[in-house]
A protein has these predicted regions:
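Extracellular ectodomain surface segments
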Residues: 30-101, 163-176
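Acidic, turn/loop-rich segments in luminal/extracellular domains of secretory-pathway
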Residues: 1-29, 89-160
Length: 176
């Protein structure tokens, strides 16, 4: 962006001179990216994996995030809702140096590329009856690499399943 001004100087003897001042704006303020909440669902005894760029799957944390300058976005932090931030290693994916955070009903592992996996913890989810649902909520930070950041939630809905009873063979002896 360039702006030009013409100005005239004069002295006490009425002598004048005209010049031009040109101002060129070399940079602009970086605008922060916009992170959008994500959702996914899993049964209490399953794992859900979402890889970067998977279209049509709600949960890929970068595919629905935007940046006004079209900067490349990365995930830089993750935490359980209400917990403390954990840094996410740059260049990582969920299965290669990803950062793991334990929630109430399972563990989320996320990479800087936005890919993640959530593994439900069977023992933690045993309290859920068949068909009952509870949410595990995580907060991630997305960065544009130029100082702009935003946060959004990853909400995993965990559904209880009906675990069949386990029969154990027994033996006993009785006197006649």
């Amino acid at each position: 962006l360039t702006d030009t001004f013409t100005y005239t100087l004069s002295d006490e003897h009425d002598a004048t001179d005209t010049a031009t001042l040109t101002i060129t704006l070399l940079g602009q303020d970086n605008e922060a990216p916009s992170a959008t909440d994500n959702t996914n669902a899993v049964n209490e005894d399953e794992t859900v994996t979402v890889t970067n760029g998977t279209s049509g799957v709600t949960g890929d944390v970068l595919i629905n995030d935007t940046d006004p300058e079209s900067d490349t976005l990365t995930v830089t932090k993750i935490k359980k809702s209400g917990g403390s931030d954990s840094n996410v290693s740059s260049g990582s994916s969920y299965n290669s140096s990803g950062t793991s955070v334990t929630g109430t009903y399972g563990t989320l592992t996320i990479g800087a590329d936005g890919s993640y996996t959530y593994t439900a913890d069977q023992d933690a989810a045993d309290a859920l009856d068949a068909g009952d649902t509870e949410n595990d909520v995580f907060v991630y930070t997305v960065s544009d690499g130029n100082g702009g950041t935003d946060t959004a939630n990853i909400t995993i809905t965990v559904t209880g399943t009906n675990e069949p009873p386990v029969a154990v063979d027994d033996t006993d002896a009785v006197n006649e």
